[in-house]
A protein has these predicted regions:
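C-terminal motif of bacterial Sec signal peptides marking the signal peptidase cleavage site
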Residues: 22-24
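Alpha-helical segment of the N-proximal tetratricopeptide repeat
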Residues: 50-79, 83, 123-138, 142, ...
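Helix-start (N-cap) detector for alpha-helical repeat units in TPR-like alpha-solenoids
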Residues: 54, 88-89, 121, 155-156, ...
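Short coil turns that delineate tetratricopeptide repeat
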Residues: 51, 85, 116-119, 152, ...
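Canonical positions in the second alpha-helix
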Residues: 79-80, 110-114, 146-147, 180-181, ...
Length: 503
């Protein structure tokens, strides 16, 4: 069994450790007509800088950031802080658009050091960023709720809070906050993107489609609206339509990496490995920096895994490791080593898997990240090696590591990590043939991980819950299409679904 690992680019993920989209402050460029521009500006979080040049660069960068053009936006935010070295929100946006962990943590520190000279609203944005960097979700939520209360007419504050809820898998909360943002400013396109994803994860695909179509209508000359719509089409199994919509995004912006990724996955889901590889190669050719090259090579890896070619997947992973080593990027090396461990674990080589998991932890402990993230890396290591021990039939080690993980996650873990406690407990129950307990625990684990869904389907089948097993197997095989775990068990999930449909 394998669980989450190297995260793929997502249409709601900004960069690095930030699990939710952090929305820049200031008056919206897409404001409606009422009330007056002066009244609306007074209702927004201000942008504090002594430099008109820095402000102009910031606003240009924010417009690009809104449309997920992170590389281009980062260049402008970097210029903004050159124009005003005390520009706290400029550093905030450098952090949210940076491509490496070292740059992210450095810019976060710079923003925090300059926060005292910023407005109270900007300070709350920065407090939320710092809390996110330290995995302190309680403090992050507190800052965001105070931000919304202080600026109840700023649509961006609602999207900020809504995206936090999205990251917590509170999709109803995300729908509520994005809808409030739209009430304030019906022309704020980013709110429709969040609304569409939240509806999708609530299985309200019709409402998701309406939101994404409105998103396209508002900014038809940007790539991301088409990318979001294409992802929904892929989730709905409309693979050919999805590919065409992704191509529309690439016609607008040939460097929009997310869309190459989507085309690659579509072809893999259609059982077209050569076309999947071709799209991944195109993604690699379009890469403009180290992070984009790594993301592209990762999709080469997953296309090989979808095709059942473990050897080729490991070979490309070694190339990723070599390039990351040249860059001295221990975060990237840690992520790749972890995924290589996942590959080996699914292949049944638990000794090799643990070697890679150990290497992943070593790299992360050497990385330019804070102590909270290093502690989280140690928890990830416990989680992974617990599962490896189960597969190796080392019940004592599995139970000991799982107990240690649970104790650490319950005190220091994020909401995601706490769901993983239930996942580990479900695996332990399943290996002990306590299927009723396993089924209940799987229900409390992440419902967006194909691995959890697959094993939950297996357990429910064994319990005779055929309708639920079919539903779970279908979701395991056909949903969460960007999830890095999907290649590992999709073929098994498809086979299980076929068996269940025949009964």
């Amino acid at each position: 069994m394998n669980t989450t690992s190297l995260s793929a680019w997502r249409s709601l993920a900004a960069a690095g450790y930030i699990a939710v989209l952090l929305v820049a402050c200031g008056q919206s460029d897409q404001a409606g007509d009422e009330p007056s521009a002066m009244d609306r500006a007074a209702a927004k979080v201000p942008v504090t800088t002594t430099s008109d040049e820095a402000r102009d660069l910031y606003m240009q960068g924010r417009a690009l950031f809104d449309n997920l053009r992170f590389v281009d936006a980062n260049n402008l935010f970097a210029q903004a802080v050159e124009a005003d070295e005390d520009f706290a929100m400029g550093y905030f946006m450098v952090a949210t658009t940076s491509q490496t962990a070292a740059e992210i943590f450095d810019a976060t520190s710079m923003a925090n050091e300059r926060a005292a000279s910023a407005s109270e609203g900007e300070q709350l944005y920065i407090s939320a960023l710092v809390a996110a960097s330290e995995n302190d979700q309680s403090a992050q939520l507190d800052a965001l709720e105070r931000l919304v209360a202080m600026f109840p007419q700023d649509e961006r504050t609602y999207v900020q809070l809504g995206t936090f809820f999205f990251g917590q898998q509170d999709f109803s909360g995300a729908v509520e906050r994005s809808s409030q943002a739209i009430e304030i400013n019906p022309k704020y396109a980013g709110a429709y993107n969040l609304l569409g994803y939240a509806h999708r994860n609530l299985d309200d695909l019709d409402s998701a489609l309406v939101a994404f179509e409105e998103y396209v209508a508002l900014i038809p000359d940007e790539a991301n609206p088409y990318d979001s719509l294409a992802e929904l089409q892929m989730e709905m199994g409309n693979y050919d339509a999805s590919i065409e919509t992704y191509r529309k995004a690439l016609e607008i912006n040939p460097y929009f990496a997310l869309s190459y990724q989507g085309i690659t996955i579509n072809h893999s889901l259609k059982g077209e490995p050569e076309l999947a590889q071709e799209a991944a190669d195109q993604m690699l050719a379009a890469a403009r920096n180290f992070a984009e090259r790594q993301a592209a090579m990762f999709r080469v890896v997953t296309s090989h895994l979808f095709a059942g070619n473990t050897e080729a997947a490991m070979e490309i992973s070694e190339v990723m490791m070599a390039e990351a080593s040249v860059e001295g990027n221990h975060v990237a090396m840690g992520g790749t080593a972890e995924y290589m461990g996942d590959i080996m674990m699914v292949a049944g080589d638990t000794i090799k898997a643990e070697e890679y998991f150990n290497a992943a932890l070593d790299h992360r402990l050497q990385a330019d990240i804070n102590e909270a993230n290093k502690a989280q890396a140690a928890r990830v290591h416990l989680f992974k090696t617990s599962i490896a021990a189960m597969i190796a039939d080392d019940a004592e080690a599995a139970a000991s590591r799982a107990a240690e993980y649970q104790a650490a996650a319950e005190v220091h873990g994020t909401a995601f990590e706490k769901r993983r406690v239930n996942e580990l407990s479900a695996y332990l129950a399943m290996f002990s043939e306590e299927n009723e307990a396993a089924a209940a625990l799987f229900d409390s684990a992440s419902q967006f991980d194909p691995i959890v869904l697959y094993w939950s389907a297996v357990v429910n089948k064994d319990l005779g819950n055929m309708d639920k097993a079919r539903q779970l197997a279908s979701r395991a095989a056909n949903r969460n299409t960007l999830n890095a775990n999907l290649p590992f068990f999709r073929a098994d999930a498809m086979k299980l679904l076929e068996e269940l449909s025949a009964e």
